[in-house]
């Protein structure tokens, strides 16, 4: 198990409503069906805190994410994309207590490495506002509608050497395997956005899967 060293510092953003904090990214360079990421930081505890996890994996056959638990809480799937070489999904749960815990990602079959990115939301609605996924395209297109004072979070799993995000700020890049790249990005928005053209452009196009979610304020 490892944590990436790029853009690792937790950062908080607010649009006057939702407070968005990028927390961490962790990878596992072992082939498994069930990945347990132990003692992952959840950031500061707060009533109604929403934890968002973007998970991805390389695959040698079509795989999907069957479930995610965050600190023992079953997460809700926001969006998921899958193809024969990779899969990526965004999940979330309300976890009001605890500053760390296990995040368990279960796939439909054995995968070739996996990684997660983790964000925390304070002052956010408990249910996602909009969700989107995309696969087998470059750029990966993830258009989202976002309420005023809301936030958006996205991630992708590919073999591109670099990722360039449009309309979200990249928080991390990690390599669960040398030829795999997992990236995540996020932002807050003061004004309402309708079908904002969020996208990820890859330096090379293969095994492209991505997903994203938006939340409004309480």
Segments from the language model and where they lie:
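Primarily extracytoplasmic/secreted proteins
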Residues: 6-218
């Amino acid at each position: 198990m490892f944590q990436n060293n790029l853009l690792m510092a937790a950062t908080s953003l607010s649009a006057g409503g939702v407070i968005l904090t990028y927390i961490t990214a962790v990878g596992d360079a072992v082939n498994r069906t069930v990945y347990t990421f132990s003692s992952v930081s959840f950031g500061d505890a707060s009533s109604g805190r929403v934890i968002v996890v973007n998970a991805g994996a390389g695959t040698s056959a079509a795989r999907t994410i069957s479930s995610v638990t965050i600190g023992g809480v079953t997460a809700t799937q926001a969006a998921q994309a899958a193809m024969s070489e990779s899969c990526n999904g965004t999940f979330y749960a309300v976890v009001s207590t605890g500053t760390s815990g296990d995040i368990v990602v279960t796939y439909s079959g054995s995968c070739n490495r996996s990684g997660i990115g983790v964000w925390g939301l304070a002052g956010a609605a408990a249910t996602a506002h909009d969700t989107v996924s995309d696969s087998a395209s470059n750029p990966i297109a993830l258009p989202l509608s976002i309420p005023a004072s809301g936030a958006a979070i996205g991630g992708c799993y590919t073999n591109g050497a670099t990722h360039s995000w449009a309309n979200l700020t990249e928080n991390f890049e990690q390599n669960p395997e040398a030829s795999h790249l997992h990236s995540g990005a996020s932002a807050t928005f003061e004004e309402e956005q309708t079908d904002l053209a969020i996208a990820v452009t890859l330096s090379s196009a293969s095994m492209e899967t991505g997903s994203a979610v938006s939340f409004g304020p309480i």
